Design a protein with these regions (language model features):
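Short hydrophobic alpha-helical segments within the ABC transporter permease transmembrane module
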Residues: 27, 100, 113-122
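Short, membrane-interfacial amphipathic segments enriched in basic
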Residues: 1-8, 166
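Alpha-helical transmembrane segments of integral membrane proteins
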Residues: 2-5, 20-24, 69-73, 150-158
Length: 178
């Protein structure tokens, strides 16, 4: 287990050392939330208000909160998948740089090497998507907060599941090409 943790730590350090990869993975959720809030929010709000009969009145705060929740849900779904692919580039770079050859002659099983890649992808993705989660909560708070603590915890749990799914998917696809 110590070997897996050492490989995980190595991959985490490489991810944070590569400023381009770090910047790209962190800026992606920020760009998406700005684009969603700028362009899609009005479209979503118009479609919500058009679907509500005239005899029913719903407060703007509730409609804005619902629209913000829809936008942040789609942002988190996209971000949790795309960020994991960006984070998992360490595995691809190791193959391109020849570092994998060094790992192959080391007295470490392939399972431990792949587990180290996978766990570091999960940890790094959770950090980046955690930042996106906080930004989304801030956007929800600004637009119309309606969630309680249990709702926030369920959304956090959903984010963790999405990161695990994205990490598994990106690891499988990276293994196919290695």
């Amino acid at each position: 287990m110590r070997t897996v943790l050492a490989l995980m730590d190595r991959n985490r350090k490489l991810f944070f050392k590569d400023k381009g990869m770090l910047f790209t993975s962190m800026i992606t959720p920020v760009i998406l939330i700005v684009l969603y809030a700028t362009f899609l929010a009005k479209v979503f709000k118009d479609s919500f208000t058009a679907a509500i009969p005239d005899m029913i009145t719903i407060s703007d705060k509730l409609i804005n909160g619902t629209v913000a929740a829809q936008l942040t849900a789609s942002l988190m779904a996209v971000s949790c998948i795309t960020v994991t692919f960006c984070v998992n580039l360490t595995m691809v770079q190791d193959k391109a740089n020849g570092t994998r050859k060094d790992f192959n002659v080391a007295p470490v099983s392939k399972e431990k090497i792949y587990l180290g890649y996978f766990l570091s992808t999960v940890a790094n993705s959770l950090m980046v998507n955690g930042l996106a989660f906080v930004l989304c909560l801030g956007y929800l708070f600004k637009m119309g907060w309606y969630m309680n603590t249990a709702d926030v915890l369920w959304v956090l749990f959903d984010m963790i599941l999405l990161v695990l799914f994205g990490s598994t998917l990106s690891s499988i696809l990276s293994l196919i090409h290695i």
